[in-house]
């Protein structure tokens, strides 16, 4: 039988949450990202989206996500158009559904970085074009593609590795790591104070995927138990965008700082251990935030020490670069009319 070369399991699909994809699909996007990174490094054109127009919607400020989507679009031959919080009125002056219909008639794809997951879902439902979640309060799928691409780049595999997230176990990055790792067969440890454990709903969702993949999941407030056997130690800011309860959060999370003592708890050989952070990081006092934190709480480092952040284990800048390559893979796969048959 002749294959239909128009077949593409991703074409026209939105990327709203990791749970919507199989392990095989996620691994394809990760591997495609690695391939596109090689093309980029060797100055080989890959303009799969020539002539396409991409809307970049940002309710929340961004450095890496905006830069990654912009450069990825241009490399793929598309034109990105940035619409910031002063340009879009989701649910304020115009309903999200109406905005979706207007943008969908003008653009070929939409990136959305905002607060409500429901807004991303409405945009995908009513725009008629692929919508890519650049971050919501619940999920961060584009970060996950970059993260697990970075892990595979360093270890040559994913399945069977152990990734430990230490910090606020309720935030979107922790949610996404727990679920994505469970889908991919990566053991995930969440090390956090009990008050900041992932919700039961998120844990149950991850457990369902882990039963199929064989991933081992652990949620604990015990540092020694949680760090043991880790290949990847990951952290994020202690207080997320828009939150104001700094003092309570800092006091809760002080024992959960990623420092050299914590890395030693892994018992993992140096060449089998890396540190990751989705950035920005409060690892010194070279920012206004850092100065404010020092004045209010008497600390010069928060979620990670400068020693770890600048150590041989650190991969956060490689991880940040991979945002571009993995986003490029996602955009090309869902909008580029490529031949990607079902496995």
Swiss-Prot record:
GO cellular component: cytoplasm
Source species, domain of life: Bacteria
Keyword tRNA processing assigned: no
Annotated residues for binding of carbamoyl phosphate: 62-65, 89, 113, 140-143, 278-279, 323
Record's keyword terms, sorted: Arginine metabolism, Cytoplasm, Transferase
Residues bound to L-ornithine: 172, 236, 240-241
GO terms for biological process, alphabetical: arginine biosynthetic process via ornithine; arginine catabolic process to ornithine; citrulline biosynthetic process
Xref: Pfam families: OTCace, OTCace_N
Catalytic EC class: transferase
Compartmental location: Cytoplasm
Molecular function GO terms recorded: amino acid binding; ornithine carbamoyltransferase activity
Catalyzed reactions per annotation: carbamoyl phosphate + L-ornithine = L-citrulline + phosphate + H(+)
InterPro entries with a match to the protein in the record: Asp/Orn_carbamoyltranf_P-bd, Asp/Orn_carbamoylTrfase, Asp/Orn_carbamoylTrfase_sf, Asp_carbamoyltransf_Asp/Orn-bd, Orn/put_carbamltrans, OTCase_ArgI
Listed EC numbers: 2.1.3.3
Pathway membership: Amino-acid degradation; L-arginine degradation via ADI pathway; carbamoyl phosphate from L-arginine: step 2/2
Function: Reversibly catalyzes the transfer of the carbamoyl group from carbamoyl phosphate (CP) to the N(epsilon) atom of ornithine (ORN) to produce L-citrulline.
Family stated for the protein in its record: Belongs to the aspartate/ornithine carbamoyltransferase superfamily. OTCase family.
Stated name of the protein: Ornithine carbamoyltransferase
């Amino acid at each position: 039988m002749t294959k239909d070369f128009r077949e593409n399991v991703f074409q026209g699909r939105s990327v709203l949450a990791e749970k919507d994809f199989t392990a095989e699909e996620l691994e394809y996007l990760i591997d495609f990202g690695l391939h596109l990174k090689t093309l980029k490094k060797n100055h080989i054109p890959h303009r799969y989206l020539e002539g396409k127009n991409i809307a970049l919607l940002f309710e929340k400020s961004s450095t890496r996500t905006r830069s990654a989507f912009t450069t990825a679009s241009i490399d793929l031959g598309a034109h990105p158009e940035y619409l910031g919080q002063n340009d879009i009125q989701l649910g304020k002056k115009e309903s999200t559904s109406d905005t979706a219909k207007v943008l969908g008639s003008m653009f070929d794809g939409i990136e959305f970085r905002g607060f409500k997951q429901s807004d991303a879902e409405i945009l995908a439902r009513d725009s008629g074009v692929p919508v890519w979640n650049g971050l919501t309060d619940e999920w961060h799928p584009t970060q996950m593609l970059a993260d697990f691409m970075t892990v595979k780049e360093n270890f040559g595999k994913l399945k069977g590795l152990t990734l430990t997230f230490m910090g606020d176990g309720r935030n979107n990055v922790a949610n996404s790591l727990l679920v994505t790792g469970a889908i991919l067969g990566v053991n995930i440890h969440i090390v956090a104070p009990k008050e900041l454990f992932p919700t039961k709903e998120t844990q149950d969702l991850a457990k369902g995927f882990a039963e199929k993949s064989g991933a081992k999941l652990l949620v604990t407030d015990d540092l020694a138990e949680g760090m043991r056997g880790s290949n990847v130690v990951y952290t994020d800011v202690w207080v997320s965008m828009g939150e104001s309860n700094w003092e309570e959060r800092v006091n809760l999370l002080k024992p959960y700082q990623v420092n050299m003592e914590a890395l030693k708890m892994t018992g993992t050989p140096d060449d089998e251990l890396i540190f990751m952070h989705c950035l920005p990081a409060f690892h010194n006092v070279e920012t206004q935030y850092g100065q404010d934190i020092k004045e209010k709480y008497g600390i010069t480092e928060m979620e990670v020490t400068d020693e770890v952040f600048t150590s041989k284990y650190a991969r956060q800048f490689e991880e940040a670069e991979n945002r571009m390559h993995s986003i490029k893979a996602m955009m090309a796969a869902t909008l580029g009319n490529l031949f990607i048959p079902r496995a």
